[in-house]
Amino acid sequence: DDPSFDDLYPVGTVAQVRQVLKMPGDAVRVLVVGECRAKVTEVQQTDPYLCARVESIPDAEYVKGTPKVEALVRQAAQLFDEFADLTQRPVQETMLKILASDDPGYIADLMSQSATYGFAEKMRVLEQRHPVRRLEISNKLFAHELEVLRMENQLQDQTQQNIDKGQRDYFLRE
């Protein structure tokens, strides 16, 4: 791909490349660590690659330790725990970080890294400067995603039961 300035989103992540792995078939896997949210302030060059000056977007101020913040943090931990159970993905390290933090913005960002919802939804989280609102958005997205995952599991169980019943009936007829 050869992205232009028009292909960029207004808010993005400044990230540090930690590792580049060449995979079979000319594929490349890159490990990056996000450092901060930022917006492009000036395009410095477009050829041979896009280069821009960015400005960090700090979190908005919020009152720490309020009952609302505590409730959102607890809800996030519960949602993420159920997500880990339903997806059976290796997210133990992320879960430990969520449990160890009381920063709603940090927790929302951690959850979004592991989330299975779409890119547009992840951008909604990224673009929100207010940490409490960011966690509210993240929790709502996770709650919806959990409903979808539960329904997928239920449909998969029903399908498996139908297959098992069909095989049992076939075996008994033989």
Where does each model-flagged region fall?
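N-terminal low-complexity, acidic/polar interaction/targeting segments
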Residues: 1-174
